[in-house]
Amino acid sequence: AIPVVGNHEFQSVAKGKPRNVSIQWRPQFTLPVEKELAPVLHETVYTVDYQDIRIIVINSNEQLESQTKYIEKQLKDCKSRWKIVTCHHSVFSPAKGRNFQFARDHWKPIFDKYGVDLVLNGHDHTYARGHVPIRTADGKETDDLGTVYVTSVSGPKQYKLDLNQIKSYNVDGYRRDNAAEQTQFFQVVTVENNSLVYVAYTALGEEYDRAVITKDFNSGRKKLTSENSK
């Protein structure tokens, strides 16, 4: 399991006191301690190498600026062929009233620079998948893939999509591929040879969304194939 800390894992012991991660969090898991980070981030920010995949877990609740250098170092030093980043708050939020501008301003450029393949988010109680294509030096959009971004929801609490807000991310190069509301999901990610396959299923086990990233490991170029099952 790759636990990702969310906003509900943080609490304050009294009004006006700083929030800290829940006392239930650390006893439940045995997670890496990144000693270069502040103690408040220990066991909530970490990196796991699983076979040929590097998974970087970010704490999107606390000390965001101090994590930026950590993220870049983990990506710069990465020897794995695939890079996945996950945090609770959505980089490209599809829900009304949600906006994680810091991530788009500070983290997305790093994801672009080091070719992150997939970013997995939650928090918004709705579903959206999109991607950022590679652009040429003069800003022209190409058919090559940069990063796939997913925001998903597994619980029964649901919010509505904000299509206008999603459209506003065009200035960041984001292109929506699929979206849904009032639906619970779980995802399966499979890596085999030069392909990463992402599939979203409804709570009833029906396939809803599929994306395949195909990568040329020599050039680093990637292509995206999307299938909207519904």
Question: Which stretches of residues belong to each language-model region?
Answer:
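A short C-terminal boundary segment appended to hydrolase-like catalytic domains
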Residues: 160-162, 167-230
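Extracytoplasmic low-complexity repetitive segments enriched in small/polar residues
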Residues: 67-68, 119, 208-210
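Active-site-proximal segments of metal-dependent phosphoesterases and phosphodiesterases across multiple
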Residues: 78-119, 139-142, 168-169
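Catalytic-core region of carbohydrate-active enzymes that cleave or remodel glycosidic bonds
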Residues: 1, 108-122, 126, 183
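Extended active-site neighborhood of metal-dependent phosphoesterases/phosphodiesterases
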Residues: 1-79, 106, 128-180, 185-188
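Short, catalytically relevant binding-site loops at active-site mouths
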Residues: 91-92, 125-127
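Active-site glycine-centered loops adjacent to acidic/histidine catalytic or metal-binding residues
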Residues: 6-7, 88, 122-123
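Hydrophobic anchor at the start of a short beta-strand
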Residues: 1, 83, 196
